[in-house]
C-alpha cells in the first residue's frame, strides 16, 4: 500500500519543472499522477521546489491545520506552486482543469519518523502567526 509520504510526493511534488506558459499542465499532470481515477479530484496543488526544501517545512513555522490538528507547518518563504482547479465543464472521465501558477507560503501536515509531509493543507499569500511554543508538559504551571 502507498504510504502517506509517498502519496504526498505523488500528488504534490513536481520539482525541477514549472507550469509557466503551459495551460495544459494540470490536465496532463492530474492524469499522470492518478488523480483522475474513478473520479476527478476537484482541487490539487503541485509544488515546484526540491523535496528537501518541502521536507524542511516540517521544522519551520508550527500552525494549526484546517481540521484543528496541531501538526501543520508553514514555509518560511514563498514557494513556486501550481494550483489545479476543476473547470465547470469537467465531467468524469474527461476531467478538465484550470492551471494557475503562484508564489505562496505553503502549509503541510507532517508526521512519522523521519518527520515528513503527509498532507498539503493549503497555500497563502501572507504568512500566518505561529502557535506559541509551549514548554514540555512537566514544566507547565497551572495558570
Swiss-Prot record:
Highest taxon of source: Eukaryota
Active site, UniProt feature: 12 (proton acceptor), 119 (proton donor)
Pfam family name, one: RnaseA
A GO-annotated cellular component: extracellular region
GO BP field: defense response to Gram-positive bacterium
Annotated CDD domains: RNase_A_canonical
Disulfide bonds: 26-84, 40-95, 58-110, 65-72
Residues with attached carbohydrate: 62, 129, 133
Enzyme class of the recorded protein, top EC level: hydrolase
Residues the entry annotates as binding substrate: 7, 10, 41-45, 66, 85
Residue segments, region Disordered: 1-21
The keyword 4Fe-4S appears for this protein: no
Listed EC numbers: 3.1.27.-
Main location class: secreted
Keywords assigned by UniProt, alphabetized: Disulfide bond, Endonuclease, Glycoprotein, Hydrolase, Nuclease, Secreted
InterPro entries associated with the record: RNaseA, RNaseA-like_dom_sf, RNaseA_AS, RNaseA_domain
Subcellular location(s) of the protein: Secreted
Family matches, as PROSITE patterns: RNASE_PANCREATIC
Any one Gene Ontology molecular-function term assigned to this protein's record: endonuclease activity
Similarity comment text for this entry: Belongs to the pancreatic ribonuclease family.
Designated name of the protein: Brain ribonuclease
